[in-house]
């Protein structure tokens, strides 16, 4: 039974879809005025993992993730660089798609853009005006009247009285209440604008997501996700707009991932303390970054440090090393995940993996389970049990595939991951490091030369060095294979 932590109710709840066997899910995507940083990557990886697991569990999923391609920040950046908004956003949308492909993130089923959804946005603004939830200010902007919506603050646990008393709100005489938020901004000189019944202008940020999600998924859908920073005011305002416009419940389950933190602060562009995905991938394989993100529960803060990334690199190296020399066979995972129909329902590894993931997508436990499968695989190989080793390798790749991991051939990963430093054989801090991947390969190559020259003493000496480092060698017709542990 899958249980999801619902930010709206602040507790884990059994997941019951609106329509049996089907899931409709919307996630707030990027505002495309710069490259993706690790905080954006966390949102994409987390909800990609959710989609993969839901599909693996047999659900038919419609996954929508929007692109915000008109916004104050976009306008400012385009003006700063002296280029059109379209040129700026097109470049960063392409970069976004390239980054998500690098991280093995499945593309969403639908990816609406704000600038292509004006009809739906205008229709919702019109509804809110007609129903008395919105008004036009003297400056031509249209605002949402928060005092008109009885449930405002339920998602974030805030009350209007407390917000008015405790929040610093910029004075705007066009508003009836300082907490009212803009739905439609009247056109300003030099800014892009669209025609509307209230004059030319452009949408506010919050109305974009309400209109796009309802346009793609209907007025009531299963899951809405995004970063923790969006819970208030963005998602709070989405609920207010959407439920006022439709008269019914908007979303059943709200999911929010925690911040990525750098030097004890939230990683963000506004603070200037961020690493782009591309900067990280200059030093680490994409699957290492993905493993790093999944190594913390999605609701917990994720501390970005080199040590944590190196630990993830070591873990991925051990997983791939265990798979070296084993033919891929028929994995039970596909690009869409695996179906439990194709697994042995009594397999204890599968049962425990599912138990972890059913507990609000507990990826740290799921990754620990992958490493238990790795240990079992290494033991089978050491015992010469080829059949069991093959079966465990297929299982390891299949379960890893649900997390978006182990998609490469082992030799390709080990080559591409650029293992240039000593890789610790354990995540525990302070333990002695062992030979690097390149160092092991060099010793194996030296031993191969010694064996060709029938210098058995030298070959045995090198085997002994490797054995002391926990490296097991396996001489085959195709060459010498090695693995840790």
Swiss-Prot record:
It comes from the Bacteria. The gene is cysS. It is found in: Cytoplasm. A motif ('HIGH' region) lies at residues 30-40. The keyword ATP-binding applies. It catalyses: tRNA(Cys) + L-cysteine + ATP = L-cysteinyl-tRNA(Cys) + AMP + diphosphate. Disulfide bonds: none annotated. One of its GO terms (molecular function) is zinc ion binding. Monomer. Keywords: Aminoacyl-tRNA synthetase, ATP-binding, Cytoplasm, Ligase, Metal-binding, Nucleotide-binding, Protein biosynthesis, Zinc. It comes from Nitrosococcus oceani (strain ATCC 19707 / BCRC 17464 / JCM 30415 / NCIMB 11848 / C-107). ATP binds at residue 269. The keyword Cytoplasm applies. A motif ('KMSKS' region) lies at residues 266-270. Its EC number is 6.1.1.16. Binds 1 zinc ion per subunit. GO terms for biological process: cysteinyl-tRNA aminoacylation. Belongs to the class-I aminoacyl-tRNA synthetase family. GO terms for cellular component: cytosol. This is Cysteine--tRNA ligase. Its cofactor is Zn(2+). Pfam families: CysS_C (PF23493), DALR_2 (PF09190), tRNA-synt_1e (PF01406). Zn(2+) binds at residues 28, 209, 234, 238. Its main location: cytoplasm.
